[in-house]
């Protein structure tokens, strides 16, 4: 580790922009700074929480996206899935604006690498690639225009963390795909002119090594596809567990359910009990991710969207209808136990059901009183429709 750090400190390292520094982006940025990279961002319009986190991480904050295009070599897009396309458009528009205002350089500018590391469908990745291809064509005859190299990517696992005991970094799996690798010949100053210098390991290869990159294919969308299929199982199972545990809690049966899971399926029991309490700060991001999974399975697999549109609604309810939606990583106050998560969600579901019932009753006054199962059970019998326990 020390030898690797010394090797990196002795060479020029390009600037990496991270849009935007959420939990994952901040973790990756802190790790890159540890290895000597300059990490930058642009925070116009972001929340005070995000601004504070970026400043605490000592990221350089540029005033505009044009500055990112001018000064950075790599842009990592790590945003909620719903912001993936708009973030790409920001950089595309900034590239055009920068090229229009810049003075033509003596040498062609180096390419700008845009790594989309978001939890989005292959179709979304291909759409962003098409956007940048169009921008590259538009700027082809402008000597100040920087070619944008798009790389499809995905992240599986939690943010990087440094182990203080052994100095090793825990790293998530960062998967990339596409026809263009992160190969960039190092730039050094020589005789007052910037010239290309061949190195044993170019800057792109160094960055791949630091990040622990795994290439999964040569096509745009392949890395995103792995992410979608993986998250459908892990986060999909989390959504099912949330429904199961909350319903069991409402029935007063949470403990018996947990006991049965621990006895019959201990690995699943361990996973879901841990996943449920880690979920609240991430629920808002997972809404869009489940919708992207629904699109992926429909577009690439031919399946109906219903299942993952349903899981999206689970996380939307948590985010919008419960106190859990206000949780932030590092500032947790609620939902730190399975019991608290299910209690808060049961309350949220009750309020949501009452709201929907009132809306339905406004259309059909008898709707809120109807129980289709009770009607089915008593159909044709001379028994009053009075539910047990009332």
Per-range role (PLM):
Residues 39, 61, 149-150, 255:
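Hydrophobic beta-strand scaffold residues
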Residues 120-235:
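Rossmann-fold dinucleotide-binding core
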Residues 223-334:
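Helical "substrate-binding/catalytic lid" subdomain
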Residues 59-123, 147, 173-175:
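Rossmann-like NAD(P)-binding element
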Residues 1-76, 97-108, 212:
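NAD(P)+-binding Rossmann beta1-loop-alpha1 motif at the extreme N-terminus of oxidoreductases
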Residues 1-18, 98-105, 195-201, 209, ...:
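Eukaryotic N-terminal targeting leaders
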